[in-house]
Amino acid sequence: MVKKTIFAICTLFLLNIVAPTLETKALTFDKLPTKQTSKQWSVQVDKADQGKGLVKPEKGKFHTYSLEVDNIGKDVLSAEVHMFRNEPNSTTKFSLFSCPDEKECNKEHFERAISLADKLNDGYPYRFSNFLLAEKATEFEVEIIWTQKGMEGRPLKETFTFTAE
């Protein structure tokens, strides 16, 4: 009888310690806009643009947001912006968008990177006005890969991670 009581108490104790750590939180931005910056980049997540033809949030499935990336540092020769979300219980990150027009990702890749860099250097931000983020995601990652003018052969990368609090 004493062994059963001790076992029951130990089990309850362990459940109180382990159960809260298994709780997952969905990534929601309580306060928008939210911004992260570095010496080179400013990354801001805000409310999604609304309008005809734009996707709307769907309760229980996904939220919608907008993203704005500004070059606040030195001029760049080429730039790429990638967005990822996580999947609970997985180390794999999932891209939030595919290649333009379902084309091969590497085709015209360099030309797009140079075109984006030119716009960023001219003070125009990269703006993604309406993107989906699954409710089950607990992490949103923006990865920027660029080459600096004068250092063309060496790509640089920064990652901005927004997590559930």
What is the meaning of each model-derived region?
Residues 74, 148-154:
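Short, cysteine-centered beta-strand-loop-beta hairpins and adjacent loop/turn segments enriched
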Residues 87-92, 102-110, 163-165:
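Short, surface-exposed linear segments at secondary-structure transitions and domain or protein termini
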Residues 59, 134-136, 154:
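A generic structural micro-feature
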